[in-house]
Swiss-Prot record:
Pfam families: MAGE, MAGE_N. SMART domains: MAGE, MAGE_N. It comes from Homo sapiens. The keyword Cytoplasm applies. Interacts with LNX1. GO terms for biological process: negative regulation of transcription by RNA polymerase II. PROSITE patterns: MAGE (PS50838). This is Melanoma-associated antigen B18. One of its GO terms (cellular component) is nucleus. The keyword Lipid metabolism does not apply.
Amino acid sequence: MPRGQKSKLRAREKRHQARCENQDLGATQATVAEGESPSPAYLLFGDRPQNLPAAETPSIPEALQGAPSTTNAIAPVSCSSNEGASSQDEKSLGSSREAEGWKEDPLNKKVVSLVHFLLQKYETKEPITKGDMIKFVIRKDKCHFNEILKRASEHMELALGVDLKEVDPIRHYYAFFSKLDLTYDETTSDEEKIPKTGLLMIALGVIFLNGNRAPEEAVWEIMNMMGVYADRKHFLYGDPRKVMTKDLVQLKYLEYQQVPNSDPPRYEFLWGPRAHAETSKMKVLEFVAKIHDTVPSAFPSCYEEALRDEEQRTQARAAARAHTAAMANARSRTTSSSFSHAK
């Protein structure tokens, strides 16, 4: 290709890119102007489309329609919050308006499609490329690719506890990474390919915010708000009651026990030893804060408790390292002494 034509082609590509960036900025500004926050909403999926071709755009499930309404999703009971209190009617009205605004945003239909596309890729462990996302989902809205991918990634993070990251910036390949140090997903069978870290993190958050022990009904109340019901099979989590009261208990991430002296018997959830070992109160609080679109310090008492927990963990790690070093030195001296006596 002649040099002049190459220059014109590059100039045309730059103009197209600038036009796309301006459109993305305009879309974001319009969203804010309408009163809808562009920050992540907690996306729990409703009914999964049956045999959905990747190229189709599904209708927005009921559970998605209220996606922005997250401020009361995991309401602190034991932990006081700095956020201003308002009446329940005002909150409900605001949530309804947010839900309507979310549905009216045309980009969110693409977000829903992309989330389902990513779930299919996760289940089949097929490579994820920018080209495929544009070809099968984004299509004519490729100018908004970055914004759509950002929203979909945030929903995947909060719902499933996984991060979507670009691993090959040249060929634009993407891959999923576990957000936390939890190893629960490594223990699942081949049939259970969807991670349940998000469900576990919700439960751990409810427990922590309820003074480190949460009544069973309080946990299910939160789950219900997010479209997860104990007596209804969920297409991501399967049998939620079994996952919560058996699977996660057997794996020692949760403890499920009868409330002492309760008659009729009532049950409660606590953190299991594996949860204490593999995550921390600060990580869980950060997860909860992200759901609320705020910062951990917005929950002062829980934040202080999480800071104390972090300090204790730091001291424990330092003590463990010191003990390991002392043992190594002792073995070294013993070996050296034995060698000297042998001479």
